[in-house]
Amino acid sequence: MLHQLTLAEIARALADKQFSAEELTRTLLGRIRQLDPQLNSFISITDDLAIAQAKAADERRANGENGALLGAPIAHKDLFCTQGVRTSCGSKMLDNFVSPYDATVVEKLAAAGAVTLGKLNMDEFAMGSSNQSSHYGAVNNPWSLDRVPGGSSGGSAAAVAARLLPAATGTDTGGSIRQPAALTNLTGIKPTYGRVSRWGMIAYASSLDQGGPLARTAEDCALMLGVMAGFDPKDSTSVEQPVDDYLAALQKPLSGLRIGLPREYFGAGLDSRIADAVLAVVEELKTLGATVKDISLPNMQHAIPAYYVIAPAEASSNLSRFDGVRYGYRCDAPQNLEDLYKRSRAEGFGSEVKNRIMVGTYALSAGYYDAYYLQAQKIRRLIKNDFVSAFAEVDVILGPTTPNPAWKIGEKNDDPVSQYLEDIYTITANLAGLPGLSMPAGFVDGLPVGVQLLAPYFQEGRLLNVAHQYQQVSDWHTRTPAGF
């Protein structure tokens, strides 16, 4: 079945001429039309663009090209600007915005021959952990349709998990690639801050946002990241550092790898069954030659309050550009300029976005800047220092990706703090700018569990290596949700 193939398998099959990129694209577009109404993972399906790109890929292959992503079907989280295609950011504010250019990530993947099947659902402006804040409706988890797929890259996760496509792009500001990957049985990697260009990626929190891939395997993530990563002069936060050969790194044996287990990851709030699954992964990695030691990240307890000052503060600034004047939603018959601003923003933004803008504006206001924003930045520095100390002793930090499996849609709506706490293990990597990966590690009551790996700056290859070696001796990542 074509839809069951991974990116790596697709590359080999296309090279062997077992089928064409156009055949594969048409098959998956039909599958999306048939199955996505159960999931709501797509905001836009780009049939014409996809067929045109697939035909072009087949032509390039006929002329002797043989790239790993040439003809590979993917889709983009709907905050990556895509020329000539609606780029909504999951918001009424940008419901009618058609991007005049491609984001660097979109451009790079298209140049490599990837085929864009559409734009994927997401929490509005990437603000959420459950994909319930989207203007286009909640996304359903294919493992249990009444549960959330995680967020904010929930559409990306649900679509790949349901085998609608082999891989997708996502973004991660506080866990928005890793957390949905964990809740849907995928592999997802957040690269080091500055590793992947943010040009054309609509901003939530500029010092935290980072793009990356979600796929079924570490090998597929390596294929995607190898194309997505690299310096971009159009992005002032992009780092001019050579991109490692992530595929070559996959094969390295794990003998001598030093794994750190932070004791703070295994305290109150963690589902004991998830803890058991994580420790089972640790035992498997030990048989592959890794050594394990306990470590401490003492300032982790402050991560969520610090994040929920810094991220909303940056969001309140970034989202000030959406005012009804240049582009985006504009209210009807404004009485004056103030009315235009007020009603365009009140009607165009959803409640979660407005909440975070208010929190951020408050934290930046004259009387509270020192008390909140500066204190949060100091905590950020302490968290970064904790990781520097830890990585002096270990090569990789391992723990759960999330404290709980996927919860029911609507279950935590009246308690936003409990939803924020689902990112307790992922947020620290964003605050410190570190690379992080989540990989499948088992199931609890039929719901997927993820293990998170963190590494020093620009060591994405090490994370992919550990995940790939684990996936050679486990089969969690091969499991498919019933009905898909």
Swiss-Prot record:
One Pfam family from the record: Amidase
Gene Ontology CC terms: glutamyl-tRNA(Gln) amidotransferase complex
Record keywords, A-Z: ATP-binding, Ligase, Nucleotide-binding, Protein biosynthesis
Residues the record marks as active site: 77, 152, 176
Parts forming coiled coils: none
GO biological process, alphabetically ordered: translation
EC number: 6.3.5.7
A molecular-function term among this protein's GO annotations: glutaminyl-tRNA synthase (glutamine-hydrolyzing) activity
Catalyses which reaction(s): L-glutamyl-tRNA(Gln) + L-glutamine + ATP + H2O = L-glutaminyl-tRNA(Gln) + L-glutamate + ADP + phosphate + H(+)
Enzyme class: ligase
Assembly and interaction partners: Heterotrimer of A, B and C subunits.
Physiological role: Allows the formation of correctly charged Gln-tRNA(Gln) through the transamidation of misacylated Glu-tRNA(Gln) in organisms which lack glutaminyl-tRNA synthetase. The reaction takes place in the presence of glutamine and ATP through an activated gamma-phospho-Glu-tRNA(Gln).
UniProt similarity note: Belongs to the amidase family. GatA subfamily.
Protein name: Glutamyl-tRNA(Gln) amidotransferase subunit A
Upper classification of the organism: Bacteria, Pseudomonadati, Pseudomonadota, Gammaproteobacteria, Pseudomonadales
Gene that encodes the chain: gatA
